[in-house]
Structure formats: structure tokens, C-alpha cells
């Protein structure tokens, strides 16, 4: 077991009840283009086209053969594009239940599948896009070979769903999906299942080729970047792949039913949610519809993902992300507080222990307010308190801010994704957002070396 001591469990109100309910019915779903790093789409559909579930919507020009499929049957009502015609979303109005069928196998056959059989089914169904690489967090090329594959079956993000609750509903499908993953490279590459040390994820009998790694401690103990760092670190010439446990369930169902499984069980939670809980919805769900009559009055920000690293869901991207397993809702913090800096702050939380709210175990109604403007970095040890990886965070963040990619690479930036620096952003006295800085550095390194 690996114990994480440095980090932070954010004391945020609105913790979800770990019981699954049916969410609001949604009649719109979307595939979001900006989730896929470096992807350039070659569109296979137009507005007004009727599509089946599992039908190809677009293909990646930079990664030929990697296709992105429809999460539901219906009509393509809108293809949203942003600046420089960057694809934002392909929106489908859900109608009917027609779907493309794929090759199915008996459960007893899964352990003897060839790598080609596994790969073909994953690519054709669009489930190849469930994989992401480290470094760079991109959908892997079809001819790429990783050092290992990581399955993340734990989640320490604020307000997250407990994977154990979800996996109890899909125990057989999860095991089938893990078996399929072991066959992707004919059993030649290790598959690591990372779980909470206290969770009781059923894996009996043991699956050949699956190595279980247990983690405990504070966030970011549940991030895949933490798992990779301690188990099989990456570098400029070494790549690993990872995916989440609900995509493993989808893979298991694909191979045993021949159908694309797009159900999602997510956490709908946060200070502005009336009844925080786990809800059953579908991949790409319209979040305005999903959260209708679920939120407290006022101006709210709906986030696809964690409050620390998720994306604002509004306008053309008002949909559940491909990799999101939670929807978080905060009040927009537009109110100004007179002399807030001098008040004792019994209703505020700070990692520096400079306010009264630090004392006693209480939950806080966090808002989107950052309480100050962007300014210079202040190295007071805050980054080191929340960074459990074997890197020097202050120096790395300085190099990212300065655009020094050579030094940043030497300090370990290739191991990281935006979510790995989310706590550094949260505790930064200078109110700097280090996620975009990291992404800019990774893009430059990939392009120029």
C-alpha cells in the first residue's frame, strides 16, 4: 500500500449521498471536441443528419483511424465551432434507440481473444478514445505501445462518487472489461488496477494479468498521475495509458453484448445542489436539463468534473464531458466583502491557518470567488504542502510561468496533467492558474522537443 500524506481534502459542503438515483431525463447529448488534446476532426456528419448510436461522427486527422462515435441515436442539430473553427461540440437530439452493433463474444472467450480482435472492436466502437496517454494526455495512436495500462478505480476529488458503490452494480461487466484489457497486447503489458486501500472491490477469482495497487491518504491519492508516478513513471521516451473504471465497464459490455454502453453514474453535488447524490445519466448529457430543479436559487456555475479541475458547462459546451464522473455546482462569487482581509473569517477556509474557519471540522459553502487578483508567485511553502510527488513544485511552477520548457522537463512536467497541479492553483497566494501553463509547456515540448 502507498500512503499519500501531502495533499488536501477540501472541506466543501454538498457531499453526495452514496446511493444511486435516476437523474432527470435528457433529450440532448453531445461529443465535446476540446476534450481531446491535439485532435483535428474530419467530420463524417452534417447538421440535420440522422445518426445511430455508435455511428462515426468524426475522425482525427492527426491520428488516422481513431474515430469518435455518437453516444445516442437521433438528429445532429448543431455542430458548434469556436475561434479558428475549433470544434466545440457535436450536439444530437435524442430520438429512438437505433444503434450500430459490433462483434460480441461469450464471456468464456474473452481470456483467449487476440490483440487484433480486441483492438478492432475498441476502434470501431469509439471506445479506443477511453484511453489517454501519459505524457501529454492524448488519445493514443493506433500503433503506439505503452509500458503499462492503468485502471483508476478510486476517486479522491472533492464531492466524488465512491467507485465501490458503482462497481457493485456492474461487477461482472467490470471483470469482463479487465479481462479484455489484459488481451490488448496478448498479456505482454501489465495492467494495474489502482484502488482505495479501504475499498472492497470484488475481484474473486483473481484475473490473470491484473496487478492491484492500493493507495490511501488525502487528495491527490486518487489521481491517476499519482498512481503512475509511484508505480511506473513516464518520461520523454516512455508512455503509459490510463482509463477510468466506468469505461472498463463499457468495454466489458461492448464485448459481451456487441452494443455501445453509454450510461454514466455520476456525482451531482456541491453547495448549490438541493439533494446531492449519485445519479444515473448518459454520456454527453445536457447539464442544463440534468440539473433542472436540482439547484438552489441564484447565479450558479455548473462544472463538468471536479471543482478543482473541471470545466465550466455553459453554451456550446453545456454537456457532461467524456472523462467526467461528477457534476459540481458552486454559486458565482460576485459579491464584494468590505474589509474582508481584516475580518476573523470564521466562515472561510485557508490552508495557511490564518482564519478562524481553519479550526474545528466544518464544511464550507465555497463559491467561485478567488478573493484577490492575479499577482506574482509567493513561495511560502504552500505548494510543497499539497504536492506528494517527488518533484520540486515551486521551481517547476516558476519555470512553467516563465515558459522555460527545458528546465520544466527536467523537473518532471512530463508526468503531469492539469489535474495534478489543481491543488497548487488552489493554494497559490498569487491566484495563478497553473493548468494552462502546463498545457502550453507540454504542447511546446511535444512540438519542439
UniProtKB/Swiss-Prot annotation:
Which keywords fit this entry according to its UniProt record?
A: Ion transport, NAD, Sodium, Sodium transport, Translocase, Transport, Ubiquinone
One example GO MF annotation: oxidoreductase activity, acting on NAD(P)H, quinone or similar compound as acceptor
Q: Extract the InterPro entries matched here.
A: NqrA (IPR008703), NQRA_2nd (IPR056148), NqrA_C_domain (IPR022615), NQRA_N (IPR056147)
Q: What class of enzyme is it?
A: translocase
EC numbers on record:
7.2.1.1
Would the keyword Translocase be found if you checked this record's keyword annotation?
yes
GO BP terms: namely: sodium ion transport
Checking NCBIfam families in the record gives: nqrA, PRK05352.1-2
Fill in the subunit field for this protein.
Composed of six subunits; NqrA, NqrB, NqrC, NqrD, NqrE and NqrF.
Function summary: NQR complex catalyzes the reduction of ubiquinone-1 to ubiquinol by two successive reactions, coupled with the transport of Na(+) ions from the cytoplasm to the periplasm. NqrA to NqrE are probably involved in the second step, the conversion of ubisemiquinone to ubiquinol.
Q: What protein family is recorded?
A: Belongs to the NqrA family.
Q: What is this protein called?
A: Na(+)-translocating NADH-quinone reductase subunit A
Q: Which organism is it from?
A: Actinobacillus pleuropneumoniae serotype 3 (strain JL03)
Designated gene of the protein: nqrA
Amino acid at each position: 500500500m502507498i500512503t499519500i500524506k501531502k495533499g488536501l481534502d477540501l472541506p466543501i459542503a454538498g457531499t453526495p449521498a452514496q446511493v444511486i438515483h435516476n437523474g432527470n431525463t435528457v433529450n440532448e447529448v453531445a461529443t465535446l471536441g476540446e476534450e481531446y488534446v491535439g485532435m483535428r476532426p474530419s467530420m463524417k456528419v452534417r447538421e440535420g443528419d440522422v445518426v445511430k448510436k455508435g455511428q462515426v461522427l468524426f475522425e482525427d486527422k492527426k491520428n488516422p483511424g481513431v474515430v469518435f462515435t455518437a453516444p445516442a441515436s437521433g438528429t445532429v442539430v448543431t455542430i458548434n465551432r469556436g475561434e479558428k473553427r475549433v470544434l466545440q461540440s457535436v450536439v444530437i437530439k435524442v430520438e429512438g434507440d437505433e444503434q450500430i452493433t459490433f462483434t460480441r463474444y461469450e464471456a468464456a472467450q474473452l481470456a483467449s481473444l487476440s490483440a487484433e480482435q480486441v483492438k478492432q472492436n475498441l476502434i470501431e466502437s469509439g471506445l479506443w478514445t477511453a484511453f489517454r496517454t501519459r505524457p501529454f494526455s492524448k488519445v493514443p495512436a493506433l500503433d503506439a505501445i505503452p509500458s503499462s495500462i492503468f485502471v483508476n478505480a478510486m476517486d479522491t476529488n472533492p464531492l466524488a462518487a465512491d467507485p465501490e458503490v458503482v462497481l457493485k452494480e456492474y461487477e461482472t461487466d467490470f471483470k469482463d472489461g479487465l479481462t479484455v484489457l489484459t488481451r490488448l497486447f496478448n498479456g505482454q503489458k501489465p495492467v494495474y488496477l489502482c484502488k482505495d486501500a479501504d475499498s472492497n472491490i470484488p475481484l474473486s477469482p483473481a484475473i490473470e494479468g491484473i496487478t492491484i495497487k492500493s493507495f490511501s491518504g488525502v487528495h491527490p491519492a486518487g489521481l491517476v498521475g499519482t498512481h503512475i508516478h509511484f508505480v511506473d513513471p513516464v518520461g520523454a521516451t516512455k508512455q503509459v495509458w490510463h482509463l477510468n473504471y466506468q469505461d472498463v465497464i463499457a468495454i466489458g459490455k461492448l464485448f459481451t453484448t456487441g452494443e455501445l454502453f453509454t450510461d454514466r453514474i455520476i456525482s451531482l453535488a456541491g453547495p448549490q445542489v438541493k439533494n446531492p447524490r449519485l445519479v444515473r445519466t448518459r454520456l454527453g448529457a445536457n447539464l442544463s436539463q440534468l440539473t433542472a430543479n436540482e439547484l438552489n436559487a441564484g447565479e450558479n456555475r455548473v462544472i463538468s468534473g471536479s471543482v478543482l479541475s473541471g470545466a465550466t458547462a455553459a453554451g456550446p459546451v453545456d454537456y457532461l464531458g467524456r472523462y467526467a464522473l461528477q457534476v459540481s455546482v458552486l454559486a458565482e462569487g460576485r459579491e464584494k466583502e468590505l474589509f474582508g482581509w481584516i475580518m476573523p473569517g470564521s466562515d472561510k477556509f485557508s490552508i495557511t491557518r490564518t482564519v478562524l474557519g481553519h479550526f474545528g471540522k466544518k464544511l464550507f459553502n465555497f463559491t467561485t470567488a478567488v478573493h484577490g487578483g492575479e499577482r506574482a508567485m509567493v513561495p511560502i511553502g504552500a505548494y510543497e504542502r499539497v504536492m506528494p510527488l517527488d518533484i520540486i513544485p515551486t521551481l517547476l511552477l516558476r519555470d512553467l510561468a516563465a515558459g522555460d520548457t527545458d528546465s520544466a522537463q527536467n523537473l518532471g512536467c512530463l508526468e503531469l496533467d492539469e489535474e495534478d497541479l489543481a491543488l497548487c492553483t488552489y493554494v497559490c497566494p498569487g491566484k495563478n492558474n497553473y493548468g494552462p501553463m502546463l498545457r502550453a509547456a507540454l504542447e511546446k515540448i511535444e512540438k519542439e522537443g
